[in-house]
Regions:
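Folded interaction domains in cell-surface recognition and envelope-stress signaling
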Residues: 114-117, 130
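Catalytic core of DAGKc-family lipid kinases
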Residues: 1-105, 111, 118
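ATP/nucleoside-binding phosphotransfer catalytic cores, i.e., glycine-rich phosphate-binding loops
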Residues: 92, 126-141
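Short helix/loop capping segments that flank catalytic or ligand/cofactor-binding pockets
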Residues: 107-109, 134-135
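Alpha-helix boundary/interfacial micro-motifs
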Residues: 118-120, 137
Length: 141
């Protein structure tokens, strides 16, 4: 977990064993015991969209939190999701909407500016069905 003012991550060198992943879904689907290089997606964006290091190049290895979300459905069944960046339930513009977020970003939108992918916390945004469209648009930006 990060602490204000402390260095986050450790200097390392890219090896042949490191695997490049192309986004948040790809990142979440990989085993946790291998080193991954995130090339795109919301996690990469929250890390400043780093350049893919060449084999043998120096880089920083950073741990990130993972989200495991269990969703209970109306029919009594449940769904379990593993994600690296966010899980969204519902629709931004109508009805109830819940977003559990790790990176702070959804695309180019920084919906949780204080989020950090290794702070041990997940940011939650909840929009109630009674919210008007204008309020939802403001919450989205």
């Amino acid at each position: 977990m990060i602490t204000r003012g402390e260095q986050w991550g450790v200097p390392t060198t890219r090896t042949h064993a490191d695997i490049v992943v192309n986004g948040d879904r790809d990142l979440a689907s990989r085993p946790k015991d291998i080193r991954l290089i995130v090339k795109a997606g919301d996690i990469a964006h929250s890390l400043g969209d780093p350049v893919n290091p060449l084999i043998g190049a120096e880089c920083i290895e950073v741990p990130i939190d993972a989200l495991r979300v269990n969703i209970s459905l109306r029919d009594g069944s449940s769904v379990s999701l593993l994600a690296s960046s966010h899980v969204m339930i519902g629709h931004w513009l109508r009805g109830r909407f819940i977003c559990v977020n790790n990176s702070g970003f959804i695309g180019k939108r920084n919906i949780s500016p204080r989020a950090h992918p290794n702070d041990g916390f997940f940011d939650v945004m909840s929009l109630q069905p009674s919210m008007r469209l204008q309020q939802r648009v403001l919450a989205r930006h």
